[in-house]
Amino acid sequence: MATMSALQSSFTSLSLSPSSSFLGQRLISPISLSVTSPVKPAENPCLVLAKLKRWERKECKPNSLPILHKMHVKFGDTVKVISGRDKGKIGEVTKIFTHNSTIVIKDVNLKTKHMKSREEGEPGQIVKIEAPIHSSNVMLYSKEKDVVSRVGHKVLEDGQKVRYLIKTGELIDTIEKWKLLKEAKDKETTQVAVTSAS
């Protein structure tokens, strides 16, 4: 009962009339009016950083498909790495990722991957795989002249559009080269299919 009477007396001391209402106003204690507060208000709010998901890191079109970048290299080109850990290495482009402008070069940018065993008796493995490298870190390479060059585009007399090396004038895109690349790729896929079937 004593606590109830104390509460009632405290409510009666508070007079909430329309003239003395504090709704919508800042509550300031009478002590803070006379004495400046030693605590400074936060001027810069703290930044909240969030890690983006893999599909959110890609730039997308309005239809949610990723924006595909144009690259100066294509599948089967011989390139030389001009910057990074593998600077100076020469290899052939084996895979292209146009959504983030990266390429995979044979025997370049090797990473170690620890593979778990799939079956109970099979041991785990440590394998070396070729990781992607950004296409801006490579330049097209001429095996004949041992020189790197930028790529140019021109139309031949028969109306065929081709790429060529600006320094040497050597044609990169030829029909014979594409036929050889296609045959090699088909042969590789049939070998993989045969080994997986057996």
Curated annotation (Swiss-Prot):
Q: Does the keyword rRNA processing apply?
A: no
Q: Which cellular component, as a GO term, is one annotated location? A: chloroplast envelope
Q: What keywords would UniProt list here?
A: Chloroplast, Plastid, Ribonucleoprotein, Ribosomal protein, RNA-binding, rRNA-binding, Transit peptide
Please state what is observed when this gene is inactivated: Reduced plant size and pale green leaves.
Q: Which GO terms describe its biological process?
A: plastid translation
Q: Which SMART domains match?
A: KOW (SM00739)
A GO molecular function for this record? mRNA binding
Localization per record: Plastid, Chloroplast
Q: Gene3D superfamilies in the record, alphabetically?
A: 2.30.30.30
Keyword DNA damage (UniProt): no
Instruction: Give the intrachain disulfide bonds.
Output: none
Transit peptide residues are 1-50
Role, per record: One of two assembly initiator proteins, it binds directly to the 5'-end of the 23S rRNA, where it nucleates assembly of the 50S subunit. Required for optimal plastid performance in terms of photosynthesis and growth. Required for the translation of plastid mRNAs. Plays a critical role in biosynthesis of thylakoid membrane proteins encoded by chloroplast genes.
Q: Sorted alphabetically, which HAMAP family does this protein's record hold?
A: Ribosomal_uL24_B
Q: How does it assemble?
A: Part of the 50S ribosomal subunit.
By sequence similarity, the record places it as follows: Belongs to the universal ribosomal protein uL24 family.
Record-given protein name:
Large ribosomal subunit protein uL24c
Q: Encoded by which gene? A: RPL24
